[in-house]
Amino acid sequence: MTVNVFTPDTFGVLDDEQIQYQQLLIRTFESTVEEIKTLLVEKKIIAHVPVSQGKDSTVVEIIVIEAYRRAIAEGLIESDRPLILSTVDTLNESIPMKMYPTFAKRRIEAYAKEKGINMYYDMVTPGLNDEYFVKFTGG
């Protein structure tokens, strides 16, 4: 029988440069949330965020949802202000990428409801004549 000994000093250690980078990311996130809150309050916008549930659009989605959550919690905007998210299923994705947006949508909707955010999340597909396969093979 082999016994592995856990040594914490070889696992999960961040150097100063990595810590500074993480702190920069946190400051950037916080300032971006504040900028979105400013738009929500001063310009009275209704945000529409197109999301693919990939890395980039998910970061934007998280920032906007957090700005709504904070603005509502602080009484800066009305809780019935809509937040609109939309995802396009191109009908040309791999099976995991086809499944993940639906999986994520349910969880995002539950989170928004829990936080009192009036979110509308629409998932759309192109019409038959606009499908990639039809356009690609149809000449």
Predicted segment positions?
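ATP-dependent adenylation/nucleotidyltransferase module used to activate substrates
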Residues: 2-139
